[in-house]
């Protein structure tokens, strides 16, 4: 059964030493001779989950070549790491690529200018900047709606008015 990364971080003690299944996109991949690290994000949480994979996996050489943006399905055991930078990590028992990503995928693990992100508007939601902006806007909108609802206001969603719906006089 799928577990969201947000759940793993929120209830890490409950998931300790248990097998979980996650789906997400590779943010980074650092491979070494005997093991490697994938940072995977599923969009449910700002933080990425570090996945540790080792040479015991039959597709180790394939995993070590996964690029940024590849979609994956991973099964593994959650290990708490209180002395490390991250609170927990996932030790992979299987890693499966669901969708490849082209070599020229524009969103790489580096800082991008806002001008560049305007050019790839369909991908900017996958960046940390826009992920944070969307989360803040969501919380702010919810707070505003709750305030007005609790004070007896009615929310009316009016249709947009555009000039294509209006009849304009013709000038001769």
Predicted regions and their residues:
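Residue-level marker of beta-strand positions
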Residues: 19, 71-73
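Short beta-strand segments
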Residues: 20-22, 47-51, 88
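Short solvent-exposed strand-capping/beta-turn motif centered on an Asx-Ser/Thr pair
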Residues: 29-31
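Conserved small/polar residues in nucleotide/adenosyl-binding loops
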Residues: 164-170
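Extended, charge-rich, solvent-exposed interface segments
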Residues: 56-71, 79-158
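OB-fold nucleic-acid-binding modules
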Residues: 1-23, 98
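OB-fold (S1/OB) nucleic-acid-binding surfaces
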Residues: 35-55
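Short, surface-exposed secondary-structure boundary micro-motifs
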Residues: 25, 77-78
